[in-house]
């Protein structure tokens, strides 16, 4: 199997001053191309360290994607490190120098002398075009390893990987079929509870069951070779049966996007009133393109469940909205949810059984509970659901005549 690795460079990445989103993106992208990463390393802006790790990984990896260090400043050392590791010098790539000059001229800017550095490549390097920036990439062969050097700017990195590097890998190597990966997301059950129920299932050869906990949801993932696709799809029915009503969506689209699409398909507009969630619902749904009529964040105040239910019923009528959703303030470990629909208004009062979670986590959980309430109504299910340390203590329904 092809051994593919990644090397991230830069002090800011090494010291945690920025999150290495490029590494996460590449790992996911390559995985779905049948090229799962076998190792990832990070090195700071130190020439000796860079040269050492390039030489080391050249003895183990078939392909190494090096990210960062192709800029015009003194701490951009990737090209020099590659040349040093190979025992050769840097040469000026005249065509890229002219391309950079054109790039700056078209934008009404003068290219500084320091940018010339970005056109200096190891003598044996294969040039790799960057159509969206000034840092060209390049490839070198060092011992057994084909190394690709890429810019750190995420938009430039992704274009180069997708349009330049992946085609070269497909041309040079016989790549396996991409693996099958089935995903679903649950809300309301703990990871250990799900695992206890699912661990009894018999997995096909080479297939693994994965769990990813990211408060307030749990993602279940069944991954395996394409040859086992039929068996995996059959097993997936059992996984969904075991997960039951805790399943809130399949795939990777996300609940706000799926709700947005359902609202649009059924021509429902939505109005929101938030206290405890502080606009989080509006943010998530607006980013997903949901048909929102009006959104408000109001000061927190103590309300009975009936007050919340009547308030959101009136708000739906006043805004001529198809649906209206409310989250009340958080008072005495309790808060209210209410959903006004053409069928009537449904309201829940919940109690937090623990206070150990941060405000941000509690807001995220409550936003998800509200979205799940909406999802369940759209799917014709009972709108009541609980989440571990959140207990439904009261419910009520107002008829649509009110």
Curated annotation (Swiss-Prot):
Matching InterPro entries: CinA (IPR050101), CinA-like_C (IPR036653), Competence-induced_CinA (IPR008135), MoaB/Mog-like_dom_sf (IPR036425), MoaB/Mog_dom (IPR001453)
UniProt superkingdom: Bacteria
Lineage: Bacteria, Pseudomonadati, Pseudomonadota, Gammaproteobacteria, Enterobacterales
Record-stated family: Belongs to the CinA family.
Coiled coil: none
Protein name: CinA-like protein
Record-linked Pfam families: MoCF_biosynth (PF00994)
CDD domains per the UniProt record, alphabetical: cinA
